[in-house]
Amino acid sequence: MEQLLDNRYRVIKTLGSGGFGETFLAEDSQMPSNRRCVVKQLRPIHNNPQIYQLVQERFQREAAILEDLGSYSGQIPTLYAYFQSNTQFYVVQEWVEGDTLTAKLKQQGVLSESAVRDILINLLPVLEYVHSKRIIHRDIKPDNIILRHRDGKPVLIDFGAVRESMGTVINSQGNPTSSIVIGTPGYMPSEQAAGRPVYSSDLYSLGLTAIYLLTGKQPQELETEPHSGEIIWHRYALNISPTLAAVIDRAIAYHPRERFTTAREMLEALQLGVVSYPPTVPYQQPQSSPTVPYQQPPVVTTPPFATQTNTVAVSPGTAPTPQPINHNNSNKGILMGSLIAGGLIGASVVIGFALTRPNQPVTQTTSLPSETTISNNDTPTVEPSPTDTPETPISQTVTQDPTPQASVRFPINSRPFTTPIDSKPRNTTEPTTSVPQPTTPSEPQITTPVEATDRPSPEQAVQNYYETINQGEYSTAWNLLASSFQNNRKLHPRGYDSYLDWWGGQVENVDVEQVSLLKANADTATVNARLRYFMKSGRQSSSSVRFSLVWDADNNRWVVSGAR
C-alpha cells in the first residue's frame, strides 16, 4: 500500500532507521516535477504528555535554524517543510544525489592527500557559518558528508540539534534539558560525550574523518597514547605531507584548548601550511552549549587569511573568567609553512614569497656551494640588525657576518639599511666597487654574464623581498615572484588584486627572524625562513617557510618557484 505522509509526500523507500525514527526518500506529490526529497520522521524518546509541548517548541526552533542554514549554503540541504502527525515530528529536506564518504572509500579505497585537502577546504567555510549561528553540528562523520554528483562538493547533512530536541526532559530543578548525547562514539571528543560540546568538537570530528579517508581506519581501530590521550595514526599514512599531518594533529588534540579555536583558523592552516601555537586569550562559550563552566580558546587566526568579517568571535553575552592556556603540548603546532596569502570564506589565498632585487647593496661574500647541503649553524641566518650596521654608502658592498644575529624588524616606512635620502630609483645599476681580497688586487667591473660566485645569496633574497613589502612597494614585490606563482589561480584567484588585498590590506609588517640556506646549485636554491607577521588588527603570528628559488639569468636575481 502506498504511504503518503501529510497527504503530500509519497514514500519511495526507507533510507535508514534508528532510535529517533526513520528516514525516507519521497516524492512531493504537490510539486509539478514530483520533486524528490528526504523526509525524516522523529519521535520523542519519552512518551510523556507533560513534556510534549516542550518537545514541540524545541523542534520548531531547531527546524527554523535548519531553514536558515540551508538557505545560506549550497552545501547544507535546503529545508522544504516540517510538520507534526500523531505525536511524531517530520522534517522535509532537499535530496542530495551523491555518495557518502563512507561509500566513496568503499568504492575506490583510501583517498589521496589532495582529495582529502579539497574536502576539508570546501567544508570548513560551511562549518564557520554554522558556528557563527551558535550551532554545533555534533555528528560529523563520513556517513554525514555526501560528495554531490553534479559538482563533487561535500555536503554536510544530519545536524544533531533536531534529534536532540526529541530527548527533552524536565530536570530536578524544573528546567527543560536533553536526556541524550548526540554524536557517534569514536568521532566525538570527550567533552561532547560528557554533554559539553564546543565549536572545536566539530573540528575534532572532522579531523578523525580525514584520518579515516587517508587510512581507511575507523577511530576504534586506532591506538591512543595513554598519558596524553593522543591518537596514534601516522603509521597508517606515511606518505602525507608534514603540513597536513600537523593540521590534523591539532584538530584532534585531546584537550579543546590545544585544538584550532575556529574553522577559519583550521582553514588558514591548511591553505598556508602554518600551524600556530594555541592562542593565550580566553574564548567565550557558545550559548547553545550547556552552562557547565568550560573554556575554549579565542578566535585568533593565523596569517595570511584573516579578515574583519571572518574572524569575529561567536560567543554569548557573558564571558568566562580569562585564564592562561597551557602551551606545554603545543610544540608540535608549528611545522612547515607556505607563504600563501589572502582569502575568503570561500576565498582567495595569496602567496608572498622571496627573491632578491638587482640593486640591493648588501651581498654575501662567501661562494655559493654547488649541490651541497649546508648546516644551519654554518650559514648566515639573518641580516645584521640596523643598529649593528655602520652607515655605508649605497655604492659599497657590506660583508655579512656568518654568525646568527638578532631578528630584523623592517618598519613599513623605513629601510633596514642606511642609504642616502636622494638614493636612486630601484632600477639603478649594480654597485661598481667591491671589497678587495687580501692577496689580490680588485678585479675591474665586467659586463659579461654574472658567475654564480658573484650572485646575491638566496638568503638575502628572502630578506630583500620582505623589505620591499614592508616599504609598501607591493608591485615591485609582486614582480619578484615567478610567473608560475603569479598565474596560479588557486593561490591568487584575482592575480595581483588578491596579492594586494592581503599585503596592502591586512599585514602591517613582517619580521624575518631567521633565514638559512638548506642547499643550492647554479640554478636552484632552497632556503628555510622563520617569519613573524604583525597584522593591522593587532594580532601576531609566526610561521616557518621553506622557499624554493630558481635563478633568473635575464634579470640577475633569484625568483621563487615553490614554498611550503
Curated annotation (Swiss-Prot):
Its EC number is 2.7.11.1. It is an enzyme of class 2 (transferase). It comes from the Bacteria. It holds the Pfam family Pkinase. Residues 360-406 have a biased composition (Polar residues). Probably required for both normal cellular growth and differentiation. Inactivation of pknA leads to colonies that appear light green and rough in the absence of combined nitrogen. InterPro entries: Kinase-like_dom_sf, NTF2-like_dom_sf, Prot_kinase_dom, Protein_kinase_ATP_BS, Ser/Thr_kinase_AS. GO terms for molecular function: ATP binding; protein serine kinase activity; protein serine/threonine kinase activity. The active site is at D139. The gene is pknA. ATP binds at L15, G16, S17, G18, G19, F20, G21, E22, T23, K40. Residues 360-458 are annotated as: Disordered. It catalyses: L-seryl-[protein] + ATP = O-phospho-L-seryl-[protein] + ADP + H(+); L-threonyl-[protein] + ATP = O-phospho-L-threonyl-[protein] + ADP + H(+). Belongs to the protein kinase superfamily. Ser/Thr protein kinase family. Residues 428-445 have a biased composition (Low complexity). Keywords: ATP-binding, Kinase, Nucleotide-binding, Serine/threonine-protein kinase, Transferase. Residues 9-271 form the Protein kinase domain. This is Serine/threonine-protein kinase PknA.
